[in-house]
Amino acid sequence: MKLSRRSFMKANAVAAAAAAAGLSVPGVARAVVGQQEAIKWDKAPCRFCGTGCGVLVGTQQGRVVACQGDPDAPVNRGLNCIKGYFLPKIMYGKDRLTQPMLRMKDGSYHKDGEFTPVSWEQAFDVMEEKFKTSLKEKGPEAIGMFGSGQWTIWEGYAAAKLFKAGFRSNNIDPNARHCMASAVVGFMRTFGMDEPMGCYDDIEQADAFVLWGSNMAEMHPILWSRITNRRLSDPNVKVAVLSTFQHRSFELADNGIVFTPQSDLVILNYIANYIIQNNAVNQDFFTKHVNLRKGATDIGYGLRPTHPLEKAAKNPGSDASEPMSFDEYKAFVAEYTLDKTAEMTGVPKDQLEQLAQLYADPNKRVISYWTMGFNQHTRGVWANNLVYNLHLLTGKISQPGCGPFSLTGQPSACGTAREVGTFSHRLPADMVVTNEKHRDICEKHWQIPAGTIPAKVGLHAVAQDRALKDGKLNVYWVMCNNNMQAGPNINEDRMPGWRDPRNFIIVSDPYPTVSALSADLILPTAMWVEKEGAYGNAERRTQFWRQQIKAPGEAKSDLWQLVQFSRRFKTEEVWPEALLAQKPELRGKTLYDVLFATPAVSKFPLSELKEEQLNDESRELGFYLQKGLFEEYAWFGRGHGHDLAPFDDYHNARGLRWPVVEGKETQWRYSEGNDPYVKAGEGYKFYGKPDGKAVIFALPFEPAAESPDNEYDLWLSTGRVLEHWHTGSMTRRVPELHRAFPEAVVFIHPLDAKARDLRRGDKVKVSSRRGEVISIVETRGRNRPPQGLVYMPFFDAAQLVNNLTLDATDPLSKETDFKKCAVKLAKV
């Protein structure tokens, strides 16, 4: 057997990922032997991050027994990261939930009762009573839902439809608010449309990669393997990595830059200044395709209105901007000189110049990648806008090998949270609830009365916590996330509301997470291939999978829960008389009848499917629910730049990147010859904007909401590690991954540890103004903070790092800044 170069790279990438985690790859991933004939294989996208790797799932006797990279998947080309190889084991933790659990005392629900098994009928009875009471006494604003970028497309669509049209409440938001909201607002402000214009195929054609606040080596390892291949294949290819601390991605970097927290804004403006001063502006592109605007400043930090920082802000929450000339923009960025930038960021001048030269060189095709370092930022929208500026000044955009690319952290943060519109302000296909025309489009398509969808933006994630604490939000359904562990400022703003006797909290989850154990009712949920699903990844690729096994016990999919619960409400119980008068034929009908059993949704018969293609929900309802929901949803985007292919095409493909027009997917948007919406002769057209032009924004540096001082003298940054995903509710139940990284640690500079009489392995108390945790000192290893900063992962339920974090958000995106708050350390 000959080992090809590709095989060599692939084998080494697998080995590297496994070695990094301190474990070996499962045998089935190396070579599926022995019982191979008895295993049934089918395709699915990976359950974890937003990369969207394709895997082959092996099932036998009703269980997932094997998993391997799908060699026909264009994203990963047969390679998995170490989490992907252990996918089968995430479903079989010993504490998997299999029946509803309600807090009960003396035979009935009680806020302080013990969790007791109940039937679905009993669970829904209690939920129904709580929902109806709140709706009757306080109205739709008293109920809410916190959803997920891990929802399938039709689960998110059903949830949004049920809440916004059925319950008439926009108080539904996804956990993608915590990770991708800044990217969404950044895209909308600059381009008028959401999501990247490029794709992963850019990697093999780029000359330079710049990572802004993104540790791709651990968080997007498959894409990192492709970047590594590209970098090692051509000595002229360069990699720059920017972060507030060193991590594994620095190992490949030609220019590894550690900067002072929040000063990335300074670096971005410096590069724009460098481009202009060195006559590197692509004048032809700039003149034809770009407008300039100056944004409002001093916009606050998304804290409560009574907070001193909010009271001091001149323009709290302002998204305003005004036109400006090129000369005015030139003068604006001219303040960000090399000397000033080096002083404010702590970055050596030669490194700053090297970075700027990558963008300024007209012969270098540059990709900018970023994730949470940019997005989880009190000026995250600005950071997104400022990196777009660099690509718009140079014209390095919407062409193979160059462009700005926001990487997602969840498997369907794009396909579900963003495209479906499960945010509190959004509707499908980039429409918003505040736009009367958009509401009208949805109401007519859904055949519900005009005025059903509220015009008021609902509560975003952090606002939901505050409303629960204040007693304004009283019934709260949490699905497919673990926000009690993942959200900020647990002690002050979340736990009080969850345990308030006025409130009733439902958590749908496969496992007894921190969130589930803090709730009043736990609903057991089907996972991954226990249901039919669809995800949309970071490169606009929509991928489907079939249900391949049944969920254990009485566990049900989120879709089943939403649809079945809708049967409990008649239109008269949720809609005012003025709405019913418009459509009297809807009187007496349930929300199930009006939203999910409509002719549009129920028109696809099960006779279209083979026996092995049926799923549990469709069997129970008698029609192909998933297809009906998808086709109804896809209508919104077709002909409007968000075109999705017909439903059946996705089951036959390894994903398709929208817009899909006349059967052809789109790799690069907004450019002639690549995007079907750009006509011959237009060159580029940013058609999300009325005039087809993108916007360069002039936005300054503004400080973080909280910085170290004499008492709390260290920056805290939080994040993830390779072996665990988010709060670890799945990966910590995989023995091999748990052993590889069993508990969270505090990564700290050796000199900072020495100054506090701390040694590696010591127990340490980490305290902020909001709370404290006990952890373990780590002065070596993969993450190497500079002096003055510590880093902690948030996967460990025994170390709730978000007891420490501040609930400051970007005022425009409402996304939390998990990367910057002040802490102190004390030896235990």
Curated annotation (Swiss-Prot):
EC number: 1.9.6.1
Cofactors demanded by this protein: [4Fe-4S] cluster; Mo-bis(molybdopterin guanine dinucleotide)
Binding-site list for [4Fe-4S] cluster: C46, C49, C53, C81
GO molecular function: 4 iron, 4 sulfur cluster binding; electron transfer activity; iron ion binding; molybdenum ion binding; molybdopterin cofactor binding; nitrate reductase (cytochrome) activity
Note accompanying the cofactor annotation: Binds 1 [4Fe-4S] cluster. Binds 1 molybdenum-bis(molybdopterin guanine dinucleotide) (Mo-bis-MGD) cofactor per subunit.
Positions of disulphide bridges: none
Stored Gene3D superfamilies: 2.40.40.20, 3.30.200.210, 3.40.50.740, Dimethylsulfoxide Reductase, domain 2
GO biological process: cellular respiration; Mo-molybdopterin cofactor biosynthetic process; nitrate assimilation
Residues binding substrate: F794
Record-annotated 4Fe-4S Mo/W bis-MGD-type domain positions: 39-95
Keyword entries, A-Z: 4Fe-4S, Electron transport, Iron, Iron-sulfur, Metal-binding, Molybdenum, Nitrate assimilation, Oxidoreductase, Periplasm, Signal, Transport
Record's subcellular location: Periplasm
InterPro entries hit by this protein: Asp_de-COase-like_dom_sf, CT_Nitrate-R-NapA-like, MoPterin_dinucl-bd_dom, Mopterin_OxRdtase, Mopterin_OxRdtase_4Fe-4S_dom, MopterinOxRdtase_cofactor_BS, Periplasm_NO3_reductase_lsu, Prok_molybdopt-oxidoreductase
Binding positions for Mo-bis(molybdopterin guanine dinucleotide) per the UniProt entry: 83, 150, 175, 179, 212-219, 243-247, 262-264, 372, 376, 482, 508-509, 531, 558, 718-727, 802, 819
An example Gene Ontology CC term for this record: membrane
Primary location: periplasm
Xref: Pfam families: Molybdop_Fe4S4, Molybdopterin, Molydop_binding
Post-translational modification: Predicted to be exported by the Tat system. The position of the signal peptide cleavage has not been experimentally proven.
HAMAP family recorded: Nitrate_reduct_NapA (MF_01630)
Self-association and partners: Component of the periplasmic nitrate reductase NapAB complex composed of NapA and NapB.
UniProt family annotation: Belongs to the prokaryotic molybdopterin-containing oxidoreductase family. NasA/NapA/NarB subfamily.
Function field: Catalytic subunit of the periplasmic nitrate reductase complex NapAB. Receives electrons from NapB and catalyzes the reduction of nitrate to nitrite.
PANTHER family recorded: PERIPLASMIC NITRATE REDUCTASE, RESPIRATORY NITRATE REDUCTASE
Protein name, as recorded: Periplasmic nitrate reductase
